């Protein structure tokens, strides 16, 4: 197998792992995400000049899925119930201080939960 094919396979596996983490316990969305990933990889399976860019894009998508996607769950049957977020260990956590000062060099020395 060629190097781009091996990298593409690795990127595809990263996306599958990321979808498993991001959409745990949501079979419908998990299957739809994996189907879309498969469709995109099948659509671009010919090796070309832009292959490294496409592989890099797939790796970035996997990272976003793994670190930035949080799903909300509302208990069934209770309309007054509040939504609960499924936050897992890989989720990137920030705080309001980092958002308020975006683009500036800032060092935050406190924990997010403090």
From Swiss-Prot:
Keywords: Chaperone, Mitochondrion, Transit peptide. GO terms for biological process: mitochondrial respiratory chain complex III assembly. Residues 1-18 form a transit peptide. One of its GO terms (cellular component) is mitochondrial matrix. It is found in: Mitochondrion matrix. CDD domains: Complex1_LYR_LYRM7. GO terms for molecular function: protein folding chaperone. It comes from the Eukaryota. Belongs to the complex I LYR family. MZM1 subfamily. Assembly factor required for Rieske Fe-S protein RIP1 incorporation into the cytochrome b-c1 (CIII) complex. Functions as a chaperone, binding to this subunit within the mitochondrial matrix and stabilizing it prior to its translocation and insertion into the late CIII dimeric intermediate within the mitochondrial inner membrane. Modulates the mitochondrial matrix zinc pool. Interacts with RIP1. This is Mitochondrial zinc maintenance protein 1, mitochondrial. It comes from Aspergillus oryzae (strain ATCC 42149 / RIB 40). The lineage of its organism: Eukaryota, Fungi, Dikarya, Ascomycota, Pezizomycotina. The gene is MZM1.
